[in-house]
């Protein structure tokens, strides 16, 4: 069919049809019947207008080949075939110069002799059916409708056919020829059956009974009835000037609508100040694991037993010393806390039977690190409501921080593949319905792309730590319990592996409300030297605790092993969300699924297999200062997952605000990209709302810098 269209129609018509389809996101190579229909419709519109002129005396005449110098004006203005913006411009200018009522839909032609817009229809069905659909859709007495069919029938408003017999016969003959040409190539049947009805047929919908009473009760002020309100809404010209409309609606509103052009948006202003620091609850790219493969020791699966077994795999322990102190803390206490952990683990081993949990002795260093007895005493409100100068503490404004490069590196690392698999393919029952089959297939493909991703490791690590901490907080409220930070995975060969990242010591945890805080001290292994990016580790005290032998291409090298220690805190509600981090997998799967659905609806078949198996195709991943970054479908899956995981790891009020407010600016910029001529008012206020969220959070600052890259490239 596509070849036929390109042979049968004038190249200019073919090009216009391709442009029109692209504007609506349709592909002429796939929707070939639609392609043919658009070309046919364009050709009929051009033939309708051909040879018809208006002379100096404003009489309508037909000139097939005459004096090219005669002062003739085309009788018909052709609107069909122009892009939407241009088409509306032409329609508006005709309405302004002639005073004709503005149509609700873009018509095909304007007749300067009869002073009316014309809607041309070409149908493969009954002309009457099609005429009614058109009339129903445009609902305007003023627009003249003229329908042609491929069988030589026609129908027009009030049987007024506008053109002379001969001109109409030319059109009918051409349509009949197209039909015969299609039939001879075996294309006609498919073409005839593919015609759908007009897309926007609105029915008169009556509301009665309770719904009607509710509708009348919920009208805006100053409207007596639903009809009265409907009439007002229908008469509300969307393309009129909005300022006037706003003042019609309310006396208090005065907004100047400014057009949003490519030059309008400025980049977001990122804060100055010292570089931002790491604030996640556990180390990400800098974490180091002590691991055991194929664990089969006694008590395997009991965290404390697993932790001791992992600790025993390492032989390079040495006398710890502080290499990067915490600016504000009492650093010797952090050092003593680590020594206490080592000593108490040693004590456990000397016991006959290893206990399932370990509560640490309440030493001075731990009391200090866990803020024991530091919280002001809570007093019942009844006892102090008469105090005259009762007031809340003054709190300092947060200090601004600038974007540091480490957070982009963290994100890049989260998108990478590790050499272990972090999630198992869940056993789900047999598929029953076809839709379940597609769903399973998508889930399996997606799982294959993300199961080895570092972001998936972070999910499992987060789920484990939060579950263990919430359990201990409820089960051992008064104890300083030692909680190993553990994860489990499978190696490439399918062997099970248990990993120890370090330890947490929990403080007192009488958590009555969701937001009550439990303090904890985290101690995590790492090979990263904190002196390389000291700003990243502002909240940590870092010790050097051993030397690790690493296998490299040149043989074994010894690297210092560090312990990152800090005081931290969390709450029941944060732990609850942390335990549910697996949701990130679902969220990113749904985003991928909507991409597959978009592909499938264009091709009119399920594209899951092609989508994941066509390795040559690249997809947009995100914006960077270099432009739009592209990558394989696997990379897209992992990037979406990493974004979702970081939204969870770095959740904060700043992120909530930035996401909600920047989305508005994003939508405006996308509308401009799609040539929808957006208008805005109080753009300055929107910028203010976005920028008040850019304070010191590393993930928010990184998102803001990505947003600036998007603005720069999207509006070039």
UniProtKB/Swiss-Prot annotation:
Motif placement: Nuclear localization signal 1 (NLS1): 124-139
Cofactor requirements of the protein: Mn(2+)
GO terms under cellular component: host cell cytoplasm; host cell nucleus
Enzyme superclass (EC): hydrolase
Binding positions for Mn(2+) 1 per the UniProt entry: 41, 108, 119-120
Maturation and modification: Phosphorylated on serines and threonines by host kinases, including human casein kinase II.
Positions with a binding annotation for Mn(2+) 2: 80, 108
Pfam family, one: Flu_PA
Compartment list: Host cytoplasm; Host nucleus
GO BP, sorted A to Z: cap snatching; DNA-templated transcription; symbiont-mediated suppression of host gene expression; symbiont-mediated suppression of host mRNA transcription via inhibition of RNA polymerase II activity; viral RNA genome replication; viral translational frameshifting
Family the entry assigns: Belongs to the influenza viruses PA family.
Subunit structure: Influenza RNA polymerase is composed of three subunits: PB1, PB2 and PA. Interacts (via C-terminus) with PB1 (via N-terminus).
Function: Plays an essential role in viral RNA transcription and replication by forming the heterotrimeric polymerase complex together with PB1 and PB2 subunits. The complex transcribes viral mRNAs by using a unique mechanism called cap-snatching. It consists in the hijacking and cleavage of host capped pre-mRNAs. These short capped RNAs are then used as primers for viral mRNAs. The PB2 subunit is responsible for the binding of the 5' cap of cellular pre-mRNAs which are subsequently cleaved after 10-13 nucleotides by the PA subunit that carries the endonuclease activity.
UniProt name for this protein: Polymerase acidic protein
């Amino acid at each position: 069919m596509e070849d036929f269209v390109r042979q049968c129609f004038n190249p200019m018509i073919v090009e216009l049809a391709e442009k029109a389809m692209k504007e609506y996101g349709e592909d002429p190579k796939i929707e070939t019947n639609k392609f043919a229909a658009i070309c046919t419709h364009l050709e009929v519109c051009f033939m309708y207008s051909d040879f018809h002129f208006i002379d100096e005396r404003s009489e309508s005449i037909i000139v097939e080949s005459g004096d090219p110098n005669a002062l003739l004006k085309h009788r018909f203005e052709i609107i069909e075939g122009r892009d939407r913006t241009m088409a509306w411009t032409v329609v508006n200018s005709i309405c302004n110069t002639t005073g004709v009522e503005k149509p609700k839909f873009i018509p095909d032609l304007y007749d300067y002799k009869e002073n009316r817009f014309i809607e041309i229809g070409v149908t493969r069905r009954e002309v009457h059916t099609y005429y009614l659909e058109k009339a129903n859709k445009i609902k305007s007495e003023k627009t003249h409708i003229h329908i042609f069919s491929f069988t030589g029938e026609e129908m027009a408003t009030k049987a007024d056919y506008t053109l002379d017999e001969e001109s109409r016969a030319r059109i009918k003959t051409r349509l009949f020829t197209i039909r015969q040409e299609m039939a001879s190539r075996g294309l006609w049947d498919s073409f005839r059956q593919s015609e759908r009805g007009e897309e926007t047929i609105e029915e008169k919908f009556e509301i009665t009974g309770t719904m009607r009473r509710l509708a009348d009760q919920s009208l805006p002020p100053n409207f007596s009835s639903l009809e009265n309100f409907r009439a007002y809404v229908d008469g509300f010209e969307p393309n009129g000037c909005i300022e006037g409309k706003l003042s019609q609606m309310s006396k208090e509103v005065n907004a100047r609508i400014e057009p949003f052009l490519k030059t309008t948006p400025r980049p977001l202003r990122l804060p100055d100040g010292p570089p931002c620091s790491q604030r996640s609850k556990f180390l990400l790219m800098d974490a180091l694991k002590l691991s055991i493969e194929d664990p089969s020791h006694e008590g395997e699966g009991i965290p404390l037993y697993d932790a001791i077994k992992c600790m025993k795999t390492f032989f390079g322990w040495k006398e710890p010393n502080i290499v990067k102190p915490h600016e504000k803390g009492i650093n010797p206490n952090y050092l003593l806390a680590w020594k206490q952990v080592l000593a108490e683990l040693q004590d456990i081993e000397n016991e006959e039977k290893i206990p399932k949990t370990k509560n640490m002795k309440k030493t001075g260093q731990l009391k200090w690190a866990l803020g024991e007895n530091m919280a002001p005493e809570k007093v019942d409100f009844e006892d102090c409501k008469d105090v005259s100068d009762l007031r809340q503490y003054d709190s300092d404004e947060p200090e601004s921080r600038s974007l540091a490069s480490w957070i982009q590196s963290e994100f890049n690392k989260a998108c990478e593949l590790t050499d272990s698999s972090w999630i198992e393919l869940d056993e789900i029952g047999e598929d029953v319905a076809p839709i379940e089959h597609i769903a399973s297939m998508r889930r399996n493909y997606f799982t294959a792309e993300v199961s080895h991703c570092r972001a998936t490791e972070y999910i499992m690590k987060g789920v484990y730590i939060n579950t263990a901490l919430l359990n201990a907080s409820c089960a051992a409220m008064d104890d300083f319990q030692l909680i190993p930070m553990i994860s489990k995975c499978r190696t490439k060969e399918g062997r099970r592996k248990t990993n120890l990242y370090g330890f947490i010591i929990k403080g007192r945890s009488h958590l009555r409300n969701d937001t009550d805080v439990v303090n904890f001290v985290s101690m995590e292994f790492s090979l990263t030297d904190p002196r390389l990016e000291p700003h990243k580790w502002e909240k940590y005290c870092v010790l050097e605790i051993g030397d690790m032998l690493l296998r490299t291409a040149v043989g074994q090298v010894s690297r210092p092993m560090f312990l990152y220690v800090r005081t931290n805190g969390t709450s029941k509600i944060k732990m609850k969300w942390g335990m549910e981090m697996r949701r990130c997998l679902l969220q990113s799967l749904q985003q991928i699924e909507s991409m597959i659905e978009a592909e499938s609806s264009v091709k009119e078949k399920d594209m899951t297999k092609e989508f994941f198996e066509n390795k040559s195709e690249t997809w947009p991943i995100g914006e960077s200062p270099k432009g739009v970054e592209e990558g394989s479908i696997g990379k897209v899956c992992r990037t979406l997952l990493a974004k979702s995981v970081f939204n969870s790891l770095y959740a904060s009020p700043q992120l909530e605000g930035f996401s909600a407010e920047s989305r508005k600016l994003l939508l405006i910029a996308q509308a401009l990209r799609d040539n929808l001529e957006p208008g805005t008012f109080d753009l300055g206020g929107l910028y203010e709302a976005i920028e008040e969220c850019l304070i010191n959070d590393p993930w928010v600052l990184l998102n803001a810098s990505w947003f600036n890259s998007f603005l720069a490239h999207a509006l070039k």
